[in-house]
A protein has these predicted regions:
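A bilobed periplasmic-binding-protein/Venus flytrap-type ligand-binding module shared by bacterial periplasmic
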Residues: 125-134, 247-264, 281-285
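Twin-arginine (Tat) signal peptide motif
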Residues: 2-14, 19
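Extracellular/periplasmic juxtamembrane helices and adjacent flexible linkers that interface
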Residues: 257-338
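Ligand-binding pocket segment of bilobal, Venus flytrap-like solute-binding proteins
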Residues: 176-241
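N-terminal segment of the mature folded domain
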Residues: 31-159, 306, 335-338
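Sec/Tat signal peptide C-region and signal peptidase I cleavage site
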Residues: 25-31
Length: 338
């Protein structure tokens, strides 16, 4: 019996030693993992941001970290997080989506004060992409409303850039002294020209560039410039005289990071977006950086354009959401008429 017990003990020890040998030296049983739930056209940005942060974190702390990405229409993504998708951080394209998460108690009520610039490390605006030669001579928001013009815009109910496009068109009328009725009439005529409402910004880009639907695509400046750099001379970029400031806000998802013990890593990840390295990567992807130094370096990427804010014209995102995008709001009335 003693011999049998000794053999069993020795085998158990050898098995344990073999299992330990498989692990790399210094490996942690619970390597930190983050999930970044983000908007549709930010895929390429975070594919470059993530390895840069991982390398810096490893260099500074000696810890290995894994970052996963999830992308879709901004509002749809936010609802997924509200419904239980365990995001460590959210990186959206409108404050309204994160406000909704704050109202649900998923992120802190004061999330916009946790990071600089109202927790928006980058910003963009809404411009037009047209086909080579601009055959429909689309130069202004009013041109998008001309009969016979087809405009590709993602659904404002699910996509942040769809909402920004709607608000930019509406605000373009108000900024030149027009009335609410005139703004509504212009937006209604533009959406009458929309052949299909895609669920997200990248789907809208695919509809325009690969399915050859539409005379103009309205989307973020960063997406327009990306398409131009990828597809070369097939398309042209058009800047309207005025457009909307489109910020890209971020937040830590408090319940998840505390549950998983990764608050430190999640906070550092979002702070990295404000670093020179993070700002430079954003600028390379045609987002407008907050850093003046980086902005000067990439000044050639951006054309000057008059910008107005959601607060300035609509009284803030909560009022804009309630009036225009809630069920039964202005958008529903306009699109049902279509």
């Amino acid at each position: 019996m003693k011999t049998t017990c000794n053999l069993r003990t020795r085998r158990a020890i050898l098995s344990l030693a073999a299992a330990m040998a498989i692990l790399p030296l210094g490996a942690s049983a619970a390597e930190a993992q983050l999930l970044n739930v983000s908007y549709d056209v930010a895929r390429e940005l975070y594919k470059e941001i993530n390895p840069a942060f991982i390398a810096e974190w490893k260099k500074n702390t000696g810890e290995t970290i894994t970052i996963n990405q999830s992308h879709g229409g901004s509002s749809k993504q936010a609802r997924s997080v509200a419904d239980g998708l365990e995001a460590s951080v959210v990186t959206m394209n409108q404050a309204n989506d994160i406000d909704m998460l704050a109202d649900r108690g998923v992120v802190a009520a004061g999330w916009a004060k946790k990071f600089p610039h109202n927790a928006a490390p980058f910003y963009s605006t809404m411009i037009f992409l047209v086909r080579k030669g601009n055959p429909k001579q689309i130069k202004t928001w009013d041109d998008l409303a001309k009969p016979g013009t087809k405009v590709v815009i993602p659904n404002p109910k699910t996509a942040g850039n769809g909402r920004y496009t709607y608000l930019a068109a509406w605000g373009s009328v108000i900024k030149k002294g027009g009335t609410e009725a005139q703004a509504r009439e212009l937006v209604a005529r533009i959406f009458k020209n929309v052949p299909v409402l895609d669920g997200g910004g990248r789907a809208a880009t695919t509809t325009f560039t690969q399915r050859d639907i539409g005379d103009a695509l309205v989307t973020f400046e960063s997406e327009v410039q990306m398409v131009r750099s990828e597809f070369g001379g097939n398309f042209e970029v058009v800047y309207p005289a005025v457009s909307i400031l489109a910020e890209s806000p971020v937040a830590v998802v408090d319940k998840v990071v505390d549950k998983r013990g990764v608050r430190k890593q999640a906070t550092a990840y979002l702070n990295f977006l404000y670093s020179d390295a993070g700002q430079t990567i954003g600028a390379k992807h045609f987002l407008r950086p907050r850093s003046e130094t980086v902005a000067k370096k990439f000044a050639g990427n951006y054309k000057p354009i008059a910008l107005f804010t959601v607060d300035e014209v609509f009284g803030g995102w909560k009022q804009a959401q309630k009036k225009h995008f809630d069920d039964g709001g202005e958008f529903d009335k306009i699109y049902q008429v279509k």
